[in-house]
From Swiss-Prot:
<dbReference type="InterPro" id="IPR005225">
    <property type="entry name" value="Small_GTP-bd"/>
</dbReference>
<feature type="binding site">
    <location>
        <begin position="125"/>
        <end position="128"/>
    </location>
    <ligand>
        <name>GTP</name>
    </ligand>
</feature>
<dbReference type="GO" id="GO:0005829">
    <property type="term" value="C:cytosol"/>
</dbReference>
<keyword id="KW-0547">Nucleotide-binding</keyword>
<feature type="domain" description="KH type-2">
    <location>
        <begin position="199"/>
        <end position="283"/>
    </location>
</feature>
<comment type="similarity">
    <text>Belongs to the TRAFAC class TrmE-Era-EngA-EngB-Septin-like GTPase superfamily. Era GTPase family.</text>
</comment>
<dbReference type="GO" id="GO:0070181">
    <property type="term" value="F:small ribosomal subunit rRNA binding"/>
</dbReference>
<comment type="function">
    <text>An essential GTPase that binds both GDP and GTP, with rapid nucleotide exchange. Plays a role in 16S rRNA processing and 30S ribosomal subunit biogenesis and possibly also in cell cycle regulation and energy metabolism.</text>
</comment>
<dbReference type="InterPro" id="IPR009019">
    <property type="entry name" value="KH_sf_prok-type"/>
</dbReference>
<keyword id="KW-0690">Ribosome biogenesis</keyword>
<comment type="subunit">
    <text>Monomer.</text>
</comment>
<dbReference type="InterPro" id="IPR004044">
    <property type="entry name" value="KH_dom_type_2"/>
</dbReference>
<keyword id="KW-1003">Cell membrane</keyword>
<keyword id="KW-0997">Cell inner membrane</keyword>
<dbReference type="GO" id="GO:0000028">
    <property type="term" value="P:ribosomal small subunit assembly"/>
</dbReference>
<feature type="domain" description="Era-type G">
    <location>
        <begin position="8"/>
        <end position="176"/>
    </location>
</feature>
<keyword id="KW-0699">rRNA-binding</keyword>
C-alpha cells in the first residue's frame, strides 16, 4: 500500500547581510523574477512574499532587506526594523551568507535568529565561484563547530545549483496543511509595486555607486488595456545635481533606464508596456522618516 506524503505549507523568512544573494535565491526558488537584484547595498528595501509551489507543498518566502550594523541613517534603521519584523509568524528561517565569508553582520543575523527559537537553515551561496568545492571545507568546519543549524546547504542561487535538496529540507520544516495561495500566484505584491521596483533596479544598477541612498521610485499612473500596460514612473532624488546625473547628457541615461525597465516589465507581466519616466527632487527625503513613510517604506 502506497503511503501518501502529506502536503505542507508555511512561511520562511530569508535573512542575511546585504549582497549575499537573498533576492536571487528567492527568485530561483519561486521560479521567476519577483525581487530586484543589483550588486549595491539597499537594493531590497521592502518585505516581499515569494510563493514557491511544488507538488509536495507550498513555501512562502519572506524576502527581507539586508541587516546593517550601521544604523545612523534612517533608511538603514527602517530596513533593520523591516527585517526583524519579518520574523513574526514564520515557521523557519533561511540565513543566507556568502561562501567562505562570515563577518560581524552574519553574526548579527545569526544571533537575531537564534533568539527566536525557530529552525534555521544556513544557505552558503555563490559556490559557483569555486571550481574546487573542497575549498569550502574549512569554512564548513568552522561553521559547524561554532554555530547550530537545522541543516546547511551550499548552493548557487544564480546557477540554480543545490536547490532541490534545499527545497526538500525546507518543506520538511513546515506544518502539514493546504496551500495559502493559488498555484499561479508568485507574490503578494501588486503589479504597480513590481513596476516601481523594476525601475528602481535599473537606477541602482546604473547609478547605485553614485547615489546609494538618494533615489526612490513612485508610480504616477498604471493603466491596463488589452495587450498593453501604460505606466508612468517618478524617480525621486534629493538634489538638483542628482537629477542631472539620473537624466544624463541629452537624456541618454534616463532613456536607458526606461528601456531596460520596460523590457523587464514586459517579461514579467507578459504583455506590451508603454513606460514614461520623470525625475523630481525632494530635498533630503531619505533622512526624513515622515518622507520615507510617504514613499511607502514601512
Amino acid at each position: 500500500m502506497t503511503q501518501t506524503v502529506p502536503y505542507r505549507c508555511g512561511r520562511i523568512a530569508v535573512i542575511g547581510r546585504p549582497n549575499v544573494g537573498k533576492s536571487t535565491l528567492t527568485n530561483a526558488l519561486v521560479g521567476t523574477k519577483i525581487s530586484i537584484v543589483s550588486n549595491r547595498p539597499q537594493t531590497t528595501r521592502h518585505r516581499l512574499l515569494g510563493i514557491a509551489t511544488f507538488p509536495e507543498g507550498q513555501i512562502i518566502l519572506v524576502d527581507t532587506p539586508g541587516l546593517h550594523r550601521e544604523q545612523k541613517h534612517p533608511m538603514n534603521r527602517l530596513m533593520n526594523r523591516t527585517a526583524r519584523g519579518s520574523l513574526e509568524d514564520v515557521d523557519a528561517a533561511l540565513l543566507v551568507t556568502e561562501s567562505t565569508h562570515w563577518n560581524e553582520e552574519d553574526t548579527l543575523a545569526y544571533n537575531l535568529l537564534n533568539d527566536t527559537g525557530i529552525p534555521v537553515v544556513l544557505v552558503i551561496n555563490k559556490i559557483d565561484r569555486f571550481k574546487d568545492k573542497s575549498a569550502l571545507l574549512p569554512f564548513l568546519t568552522h561553521i559547524n563547530e561554532n554555530h547550530t543549524f537545522a541543516t546547511i546547504h551550499p548552493v548557487s542561487a544564480l546557477k540554480r545549483k543545490g536547490l532541490k535538496t534545499l527545497v526538500s529540507d525546507l518543506l520538511a520544516l513546515l506544518p502539514e496543511g493546504g496551500p495559502m495561495f493559488s498555484e499561479d500566484e508568485i507574490t503578494d505584491r501588486s503589479q504597480r509595486f513590481l513596476a516601481s521596483e523594476l525601475v528602481r533596479e535599473q537606477v541602482m544598477r546604473q547609478l547605485g555607486k553614485e547615489l546609494p541612498y538618494a533615489t526612490t521610485v513612485e508610480i504616477e499612473y498604471f493603466t491596463e488595456n488589452t495587450g498593453l500596460f501604460r505606466i508612468g514612473a517618478l524617480i525621486w532624488v534629493e538634489r538638483e545635481s542628482q537629477k542631472a546625473i539620473v537624466i544624463g547628457k541629452g537624456g541618454v541615461r534616463l532613456k536607458e533606464i526606461g528601456v531596460k525597465a520596460r523590457q523587464q516589465m514586459e517579461r514579467l507581466f507578459q504583455t506590451k508596456v508603454f513606460l514614461e519616466t520623470w525625475v523630481r527632487v525632494r530635498k533630503d527625503w531619505s533622512n526624513n522618516e515622515a518622507a520615507l513613510k510617504t514613499f511607502g517604506y514601512e
